[in-house]
From Swiss-Prot:
Record lineage: Eukaryota, Metazoa, Chordata, Craniata, Vertebrata
Protein name: Cilia- and flagella-associated protein 141
Pfam families: CFAP141
Organism: Bos taurus
Localization, UniProt: Cytoplasm, Cytoskeleton, Cilium axoneme; Cytoplasm, Cytoskeleton, Flagellum axoneme
UniProt keyword terms in alphabetical order: Cell projection, Cilium, Cytoplasm, Cytoskeleton, Flagellum
Gene Ontology CC terms, in alphabetical order: axonemal A tubule inner sheath; axonemal microtubule; sperm flagellum
Function statement: Microtubule inner protein (MIP) part of the dynein-decorated doublet microtubules (DMTs) in cilia axoneme, which is required for motile cilia beating.
The keyword Transport is assigned to this record: no
Length: 101
């Protein structure tokens, strides 16, 4: 073989090695990307479940607070009506029976 052909063969060999390294790097990065995607897909359902659980807990607490507020408002309304009814009876000369201790 002549030196010229040897140089071309060597050049093609170097180019083939560079392409092989590039393909190897691409495969590694592709594998890494796929691993990251599957990791995030596995992690996301757990995060979603935690958020849903937190939302359920917050909703339960909000409902409990709303119930307490409504009960307090109803208690105030009954107390106000009781006072009004007692005042009307006092104006008529009548009264509630109250046991004194």
């Amino acid at each position: 073989m002549s030196m010229e052909k040897m140089g071309k063969v060597e050049e093609h060999f170097q180019r083939a090695l560079e392409l092989k390294k590039m393909v190897h790097r691409w495969r590694n990065s592709h594998t890494h990307c796929l691993w990251q995607i599957t990791l995030s897909q596995r992690r996301n359902p757990y995060a979603i479940l935690r958020m849903q659980d937190t939302m359920v807990q917050e909703l339960a607490l909000a409902n409990k607070q709303l119930l307490m507020v409504r009960q307090a408002a109803l208690h105030q309304l009954f107390e106000k009506e009781h006072q009004q009814y007692q005042q009307e009876l006092n104006e008529k000369g009548k009264a509630f029976y109250m046991e004194r201790l």
